[in-house]
């Protein structure tokens, strides 16, 4: 019986527990923060009929709204974000100036439901905005993108404006950049072009709470068509001059020169090497030939004429084999002297 009663009471206990937890869960769901949510890109994206109400996730206890307004001498626009945020409640306002482009940022965070609709997101007059017709044009021309989408602000598509000086400032430079606003985990970005004071700024920027305005400047008629990937320097800086690369002879010319050099010097080297070897090899034989040549030369001088040269050219050569041998002139003279001596002896004996 006790076991049966325990089995019957167990489902009742689980049901009772769920009934007790249900109000707590309902209270927790009811306590989720509700915030307005919208995005404005120089349009009416945050107008009352376009705003939505969202429930924030766990751990989110503030609603956020942020607005950034940008103004040049030719116009102004604003970007804004509303939604569930993070951080501490409060309000932050800041004004910025980038070479004559003015910006005003407001950030507001609150902890009540749908409390993030207090800021004025409409356009506001910022100095130096004024009546353009009241100023005289200074001759500079620039492309102007104030609140245009990126599709309408490409290259030479945006309108061209004439720059003028305002509030004691000289606007003769052209600007090309971007404005970026980040709030409630949403980032909004739009292009910015127009007349500015600086004529040679390079990727300059100003920042505020979740806000950035940055870009580059240039000088010249409509020079701000695209400065994102270009670098401009002040006219006071000397220009950079690129030197031409050094010229080198073609590979075929070097090959011909080297081959001609080798063919020219090779015989000289070979001749120089052979000469000492020949002299050393024939040194002993040439000594004997020189002595024999001196003797023959003396005989030739005594005999005289071309005969001496002829005998010297044939000296040191062995007689050819076969045939009659022709005696030299020196042998003929000796034979004549010997015959003369015999005849004289015979004549002398006969006389005695």
From Swiss-Prot:
Bias (Pro residues) ranges: 236-249
Intracellular or extracellular location(s): Cell membrane
A GO molecular function held by the record: laminin binding
Region annotated Disordered, chain positions: 236-330
SUPFAM superfamilies: Snake toxin-like
First-listed, main subcellular location of the protein, grouped into a coarse class: membrane
Signal is among the record's keywords: yes
Topological type in the membrane: Lipid-anchor; GPI-anchor
Lipidation (GPI-anchor amidated glycine): 330
Low complexity composition bias: residue spans: 250-285
Tissues in which the UniProt entry reports expression: Found predominantly on the basal layers of squamous epithelium. Expressed in the gravid uterus and on epithelial of the upper gastrointestinal tract. It has been found in tumor lines which metastasize via the lymphatic system.
One cellular-component annotation, GO: side of membrane
CDD domains tied to this protein: TFP_LU_ECD_LYPD3_rpt1, TFP_LU_ECD_LYPD3_rpt2
InterPro entries with a match to the protein in the record: LY6_UPA_recep-like, Snake_toxin-like_sf
Ranges annotated as biased composition (Basic and acidic residues): 286-300, 309-320
Propeptide segment residues: 331-352
Domain UPAR/Ly6: 35-128, 142-224
Keywords: Cell membrane, Glycoprotein, GPI-anchor, Lipoprotein, Membrane, Repeat, Signal
Signal peptide span: 1-32
Subunit relationships: Interacts with AGR2 and AGR3. Binds laminin-1 and laminin-5. Interacts with LGALS3.
Protein name: Ly6/PLAUR domain-containing protein 3
Annotated source species: Rattus norvegicus
Gene name tied to this protein: Lypd3
């Amino acid at each position: 019986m006790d076991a049966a009663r325990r089995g019957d009471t167990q489902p009742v206990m689980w049901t009772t527990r769920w009934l007790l937890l249900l109000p707590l869960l309902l209270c927790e769901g009811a306590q989720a923060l509700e915030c307005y949510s919208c995005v404005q890109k120089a349009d009416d994206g945050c107008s009352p009929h376009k705003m939505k109400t969202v429930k924030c996730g766990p751990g989110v206890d503030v609603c956020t709204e942020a607005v950034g307004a940008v103004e040049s001498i030719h116009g102004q626009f604003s970007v804004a974000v509303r939604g569930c945020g993070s951080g501490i409640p409060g309000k932050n306002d800041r004004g910025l100036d980038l070479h004559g482009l003015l910006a005003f940022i407001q950030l507001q965070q609150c902890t009540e439901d749908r409390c993030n609709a207090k800021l004025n997101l409409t356009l506001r007059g910022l100095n130096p905005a004024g009546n353009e017709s009241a100023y005289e044009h200074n001759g500079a021309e620039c492309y102007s993108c104030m609140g245009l989408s990126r599709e309408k602000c490409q290259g030479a598509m945006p309108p061209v404006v004439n720059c003028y000086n305002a509030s004691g400032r000289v606007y003769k430079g052209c600007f090309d950049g971007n404005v970026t606003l980040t709030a409630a985990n949403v980032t909004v970005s739009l292009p910015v072009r127009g007349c500015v004071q600086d004529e040679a700024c390079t990727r300059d920027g100003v920042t505020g709470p979740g806000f950035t305005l940055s870009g580059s400047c240039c000088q010249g008629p409509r020079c701000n068509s695209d400065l994102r990937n270009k670098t401009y320097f002040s006219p006071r800086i000397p220009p950079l001059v690129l030197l031409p690369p050094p010229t080198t002879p073609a590979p075929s010319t070097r090959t011909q020169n080297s081959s001609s050099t080798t063919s020219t010097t090779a015989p000289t080297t070979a001749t120089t090497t052979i000469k000492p070897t020949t002299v050393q090899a024939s040194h002993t034989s040439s000594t004997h030939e020189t002595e024999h040549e001196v003797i023959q030369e003396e005989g030739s001088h005594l005999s005289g004429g071309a005969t001496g040269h002829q005998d010297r050219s044939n000296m040191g050569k062995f007689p050819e084999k076969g045939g009659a041998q022709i005696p030299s002139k020196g042998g003929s003279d000796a034979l004549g002297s010997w015959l003369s001596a015999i005849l004289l002896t015979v004549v002398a004996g006969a006389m005695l």
